[in-house]
Amino acid sequence: MSLVRDLRIMAAQTIGLGVGIGEVFFVVTARDTTDAYYSYLRTKYVPEGMIYTTVATAYAAAVSDRNDIIFKMPGIETVAAELDWAKNRTHLVGLGGPQQKGYESGTGLYSSTITVANVIHNTGVNNQFHNITVMNAGANATCLSAFKNAGYGTRMIGCQIIGHAAATQAATALANSLEIAEGGYYFYAEKCNFGSTDFGTLGANTAAVLVFSNTTGGAAPSDGKFVNCNFSAQINATTRCLIYSTRLGLDRDWIFDRCEFYAFAANHGYVMTQVATNEANPTTYDMVFKDCVAINCTEFRTDSNGCTWTIGPAADGKGGIAVVVT
């Protein structure tokens, strides 16, 4: 049985792409015998034409709506341009396993280029991203996101998404790790890490790990879900937040199931007032925190025109909150 066939079966059974899988592509550091992954692929009779040295060139070879899969070999690729992921049902899968905190030994994409607004900008439909790290460390106010999602039906499993990693970024309004933009309906993430306590202190009240950015009436993304995910950032003021929404940023239900929220401050010098907040006079929505914990935060939400629900163990009447007792 060939390696390509093995990976097709794995994708169908483990990742859940079904049996209608299109072409597969591989990304290595170099197409050279000194590259262990390239050499391995060639010994397994993977054709030269299926092996690429950047995710962008592999993506260019993929065909929209064919359920093509790009397999990224372990290692971080440094990019100098935004990757516009506009094709539908075109998937990116890291072969280094679920991504842990700390990008250096991960599998994915990194940018420190000051002109890269979003490392990946997904506008395609029903795309999946598995076991991938994406980091934007550009020291510029234009470097807003690591991953911007403006396509519906996106699934993200076992990924690590880190933005606002430089001081200039982190002090910019709406800077984020993950941006849910207009068109980003039906988003689903599971076992992912968003943000980091190792890079960039949030320096603006509207910068956050997760930002809902839509400004178009009637286009607010809805029906999203995060399962067993971690959201974390450094803070230097009580007014910072981990989730921020513009006035028309989201609609209907957004569910956080068994997620952790961590606002790190040295020596607990600051306690975040609320995990989530929004621009004044927002559209009505329901944000549910089911069996979640928020560390070094006072509440999930103080007040809102939308509705915030917390379900789970209570501490001082604020479900799942963990604060320093003084």
List each model region and its residues.
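Right-handed parallel beta-helix/beta-solenoid
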Residues: 1-57, 326
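Extracellular beta-strand/beta-solenoid scaffold signature
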Residues: 80, 105-121, 137-148, 165-184, ...
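Flexible, charged surface loops at secondary-structure boundaries
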Residues: 18-22, 61-66, 84-87, 121-123, ...
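Surface-exposed or flexible loop/turn and strand-edge residues in extracellular/cell-surface modules
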Residues: 4, 12, 22, 67, ...
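N-terminal segments that cap or nucleate solenoid repeat domains
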Residues: 58-67, 322-326
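Surface-exposed intrinsically disordered loops and tails
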Residues: 32-44, 104-111, 274-279, 311
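N-terminal extracellular ligand-recognition/capping segment immediately after the signal peptide
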Residues: 56, 64-116, 133-138
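Right-handed parallel beta-helix
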Residues: 93-96, 125-136, 152-165, 183-200, ...
